[in-house]
Amino acid sequence: MNKLILIAMGLFTSIFSFAETNGKDVKIPEEKFVVIESSADGMPAIIVVNTSLRKFRHKELYGWTCSLVIKFKDMAINGMPTADESNYVFDYIEELDKTIKGDSIQPNAVYLARITWNGACEVIWQVKDPKVVHEYLGAIINNKTYPRELDYRIEFDKKWEKVSVYNKIKP
């Protein structure tokens, strides 16, 4: 039901020190979101993208993509959640976001996008230290403290190639 995929985390973390910036602090741009209404396979999709990361110059420091998928329980029509369900899940995502990011000045992750489509919500972060995120999300799953069925995966993507489509969206 909840599979965990963490690809070569230990190897890459030891080879590449993503938390290091040669003693310099990295300025994280203030989040700016654009909302896109789209469709896929005949079903509506709502995509929320943090466009401030488009020109972010330190992408390699956040070289891990964390994708979290939460399944909605209460559905309206066309695979979209009811307003109450949407609010409930998005409030939960906000709590996850705070913990996954950690420090607000030098966060462990940056919020890239959220996609609501076909009965689920996918949230994407770019992460510095995947071990911290894996331990946090793994504990939620192992302790069954999640309000809705969820799954996640963390993959190495130093150049953000797998999520490049989100950096091309214009406000």
Task: Enumerate the language-model features and the residues they cover.
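Conserved short beta-strand edge segments in small beta-sheet-based binding/regulatory domains
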Residues: 143-169
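Short beta-strand
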Residues: 111-117
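The conserved glycine-aromatic submotif of the RRM
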Residues: 117-123
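Short amphipathic alpha-helices in soluble, non-transmembrane regions
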Residues: 136-144
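Hydrophobic h-region of N-terminal signal peptides that target proteins for export
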Residues: 10-17
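Sec-dependent signal peptide recognition
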Residues: 2-8
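Helix N-cap motif at beta-to-alpha junctions
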Residues: 126-134
